[in-house]
């Protein structure tokens, strides 16, 4: 498929002249959103205020809605799943992906800041320590609800939706999945791998490599979930499952008890 065929009917009128589901648009979007996200997350790691990061996920979710016409939204998978029962499989696949990363992190890095989930637990600002069981459950439900909505919807509409389809015309489905998964994994270095400590910013080479590789494979799982369900909802459900498992482990396996 040529870029000309992928452009005009897919984007809203104000954007049709400049944008298309092609490599150029994909690279522009990746460059812009990666740079902004790195800046916001790294600043949030210092200030412990993640409000703007949540706003950024909303912007990611709105971007396809703002840019794309109806046919474009359908093209990126914004349709009802052809196989709705696969959404449950997608959710479970996301949970399993996270569990494998949790186990490998514990085996390789122990309970220090070299463990991504331990480090990320430290970004949960304002939590009481220690917590009683009722408080822990309430906070887990709040954080799980946030984690299963903001980033899964925003990131999957962007990476497995808009970015992925920008590369399929030139690269095909499989190689486009490699591109969007690699971009997804790389940007998460801002969340872990390049970490903030009292002495300043520190790069953890081994843990960072493990983190990026793990999230690259996870991105491929999310792509599989989209293909298996026939809808971007599959990827969103898989991502939500991953975040549910991560939040559960942080609250019940990492944070101190009462």
Language-model region placement:
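N-terminal, membrane-interfacial amphipathic/helix-forming hydrophobic leader that caps
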Residues: 1-89, 95-96, 244-258
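Residue-level signature of transmembrane alpha-helical entry/exit and packing/kink sites
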Residues: 17-29, 53-57, 86-90, 136-144, ...
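Hydrophobic, lipid-facing residues on alpha-helical transmembrane segments of integral membrane proteins
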Residues: 23-27, 31-35, 39, 88-107, ...
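Membrane-water interface at transmembrane helix exits
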Residues: 36, 40-44, 68, 101, ...
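Juxtamembrane helix-loop-helix connectors linking adjacent transmembrane helices
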Residues: 75-151, 169, 199-203, 256-258
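Transmembrane helix-loop-helix hairpins at the membrane interface
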Residues: 138-258
């Amino acid at each position: 498929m040529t870029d000309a065929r992928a452009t005009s009917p897919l984007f809203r009128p104000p954007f049709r002249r400049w944008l298309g589901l092609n490599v150029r648009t994909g690279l522009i979007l990746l460059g812009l959103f990666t740079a902004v996200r790195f800046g916001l997350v790294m600043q949030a790691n210092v200030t412990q205020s993640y409000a703007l990061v949540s706003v950024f996920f909303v912007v990611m979710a709105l971007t396809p809605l703002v840019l794309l016409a109806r046919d474009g939204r359908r093209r990126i998978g914004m349709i009802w799943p052809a196989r709705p029962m696969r959404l449950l499989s997608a959710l479970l696949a996301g949970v399993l992906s996270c569990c494998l990363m949790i186990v490998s992190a514990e085996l390789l890095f122990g309970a220090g800041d070299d463990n991504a989930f331990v480090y990320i637990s430290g970004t949960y600002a304002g939590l009481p320590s220690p917590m009683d069981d009722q408080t822990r459950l309430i906070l887990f439900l709040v954080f799980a609800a946030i984690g299963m909505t903001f980033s899964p919807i925003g990131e999957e509409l962007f990476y497995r939706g808009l970015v992925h389809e920008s590369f399929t015309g030139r690269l095909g489905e499989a190689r486009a999945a490699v591109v969007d998964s690699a971009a997804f994994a790389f940007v998460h270095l801002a969340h872990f791998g390049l970490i903030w400590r009292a002495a300043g910013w520190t790069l953890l080479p081994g843990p960072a490599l493990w983190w990026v590789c793990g999230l690259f494979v996870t991105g491929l799982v999310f792509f599989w979930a989209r293909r298996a369900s026939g809808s971007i909802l599959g990827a969103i459900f898989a991502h939500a499952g991953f975040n549910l498992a991560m939040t559960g482990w942080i609250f019940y396996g990492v944070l101190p008890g009462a």
